[in-house]
Amino acid sequence: MQYAYDAMKEVLDENKWLHVFPEAACWAFYPAIRPFRIGVFKLAVEENLPILPMVVKHRKPNPIWRIFKKHPNAKLIIGAPVVPDNSLDTKEKISDLEYRSRTEMMRLLGLDNESNQRLIDSLPTYHVESKSLFK
């Protein structure tokens, strides 16, 4: 894991754009926000950088559209930047940044904590490797 963290830090040091799925993976058609890994938030706090919350909403094409297009539709929704709160100590700052980023991502999907947790509880806890959507 240290290798991945160092690689992310190197990208930021070069002033490049860094996109990370804080859940550690992107599962197509998974409607909930899964638990986050804390590393990206720790890095954002260390570098004093904002998090730009984004969610991908997938939906299958309606029956008419399936005639012309067989791949599911995806919509990228970008939220407001979430900036580290410099009035907090480092540990609290990381936790707060993670919480506010998660809250913004759920808002973008139209979820609250309860409905998000119900979705997580109702869905399988395993992931079967899926085929690429673009083949």
Q: Where do the language-model regions lie?
A:
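Non-catalytic C-terminal accessory region of glycerolipid acyltransferases
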Residues: 3-135
